[in-house]
Amino acid sequence: VEGLRILDIGCGGGLLAEPMARLSGIVTGIDATAEAIEAARAHAATAGLDIDYRCCTAEALAEEGASFDVIYASEVIEHVTDRRLFAASIAAMLAPGGTVVITTINRTLASLALAKVAMEYVFRLVPAGTHNPARFVKPHELRSEFAGTGIILDDMTGFAPRPARRIGGLHAEQVRLSRRRGGCGGCDRALRHRPRPALRG
């Protein structure tokens, strides 16, 4: 992680950004909610961490010509209105050989029960109305939406977090995407700065 330029899209209060900064990553966190950015900045200051938090969208940041080695968007794309534009913005910001990691909620009955019903109404871990099941994302839809951006699907893994870490667990799709020219493989390898050989074709 040391020295890697890392972008956390939809950073919220900095749950991912802070650990990456502690590992000496050069971290930028963006969120469209001003209150989240204010809270993230305050917490980072208290922890003595140097993180560049900005209240903006991925699309706006891409227009500035920003470039990153690792781009992470966790539980974000299912809230995006134009996913193809979102994918194009990520592609524009990804440095050659860089890695993108996306986690999102698969559109299944199990996900509906857990992410919508359980999380919002049973355990009340997120506000009611947070999730719109119509925007949950099927794997083949992600493949289609990222096609033509210069990013190819490298690895896709379905997972359910352990109940001890998140009540109920969400069935989701963890998608790792890498640029066709010199793509890194899985996120664990990318964050250790040990990329796989360049992909051909």
Regions found by a protein language model. Give the residues of each.
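Conserved class I S-adenosyl-L-methionine
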Residues: 4-10, 99-123
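Class I SAM-dependent methyltransferase SAM/SAH-binding core
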Residues: 13-60
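A C-terminal cap/extension of S-adenosyl-L-methionine-dependent methyltransferases
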Residues: 47, 122, 144, 148-201
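A conserved beta-strand element that flanks and buttresses the S-adenosyl-L-methionine
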Residues: 72
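Hydrophobic adenine-recognition pocket in adenosine-nucleotide-binding enzymes
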Residues: 76
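A short glycine-rich, Lys/Arg-flanked "PGG" loop and its adjoining helix->strand segment in the class I
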Residues: 85-96
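Acceptor-substrate binding/catalytic loop of class I
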Residues: 124-141
